[in-house]
C-alpha cells in the first residue's frame, strides 16, 4: 500500500472520529480532546528530553491550552458546534491545501533549514484553501463575518505552528513525534497546526467576533 494511500485512509478515519465526537459534544468530545492532549504532552516530553525543566513545563501548557480552547469553543453557546467545525475546516484545508500544491508545484523552499519539504507554493496553497473553504462555511452557517478575514490569517498561524514543531524535531534529531498514526507520525505531527487555530479562535470568540 502506497504511503499516500495510507496517509489518506488514516486521515479520513481521524476526521470521522473528530466529527463524531464534536457532534456528540459533552463527555465524548472531552474524552477525545483529553486523549489527544495527553499524547501531545507525552510526545513533547520525549522530544525535549534533556532541554531543561522549562521546556517540560512548556509542553504542559502547549497541550493544555488548546484542549481548553476546543472545549470552550464547543460548549460555549449554540453556535459552538458550527464554530468548532470552522476550526477543523481551516486547519484541515490549510494542511491539504499546502500538501498538494507543495508536492506538485513547489519549487521555492519556505524554511529549508527547518523543514526542507515545505515550500512557498504550499504556504499560499494552504492560505487559499483555508480562505475559500473557511469562508464558505461562514457564509453557509451565518457565523461572524470577521471569520472571513480570520480564515486566511489563521492558516498562516497553522503553518507557523507546523514549522515550530518541525524546528523542535530537527533540534532533537528525529523525523516524527511518534508512530501512533500511520502515514502521519504522532499526535504532535497531526495537531501542530490545530494548536494556534484553536487558541486564536477561542480568543476571537471571547471578543465577540465569531
Q: What kind of feature is each model-predicted range?
A:
Residues 100, 167-170:
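Pseudouridine synthase
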Residues 1-156:
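Membrane-embedded alpha-helical bundles of polytopic integral membrane proteins
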Residues 202-210:
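Juxtamembrane boundary at the C-terminal end of a transmembrane helix
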Residues 197-198:
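C-terminal-most transmembrane helix of multi-pass membrane proteins
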Amino acid at each position: 500500500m502506497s504511503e499516500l494511500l495510507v496517509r489518506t485512509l488514516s486521515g479520513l478515519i481521524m476526521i470521522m472520529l473528530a466529527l463524531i465526537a464534536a457532534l456528540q459534544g459533552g463527555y465524548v468530545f472531552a474524552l477525545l480532546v483529553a486523549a489527544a492532549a495527553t499524547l501531545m504532552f507525552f510526545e513533547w516530553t520525549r522530544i525535549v528530553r534533556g532541554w531543561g525543566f522549562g521546556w517540560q513545563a512548556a509542553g504542559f501548557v502547549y497541550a493544555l491550552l488548546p484542549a481548553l480552547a476546543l472545549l470552550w469553543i464547543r460548549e460555549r453557546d449554540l453556535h459552538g458546534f458550527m464554530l468548532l467545525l470552522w476550526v477543523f475546516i481551516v486547519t484541515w484545508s490549510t494542511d491539504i491545501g499546502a500538501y498538494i500544491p507543495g508536492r506538485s508545484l513547489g519549487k521555492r523552499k519556505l524554511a529549508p533549514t527547518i523543514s526542507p519539504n515545505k515550500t512557498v507554493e504550499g504556504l499560499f496553497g494552504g492560505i487559499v484553501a483555508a480562505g475559500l473553504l473557511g469562508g464558505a462555511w461562514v457564509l453557509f452557517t451565518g457565523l461572524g463575518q470577521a471569520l472571513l478575514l480570520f480564515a486566511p490569517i489563521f492558516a498562516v498561524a497553522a503553518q507557523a505552528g507546523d514549522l515550530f514543531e518541525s524546528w523542535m524535531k530537527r533540534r532533537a534529531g528525529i523525523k516524527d513525534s511518534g508512530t501512533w498514526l500511520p502515514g502521519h507520525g504522532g499526535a504532535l505531527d497531526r495537531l501542530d497546526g490545530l494548536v494556534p487555530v484553536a487558541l486564536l479562535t477561542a480568543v476571537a470568540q471571547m471578543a465577540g467576533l465569531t
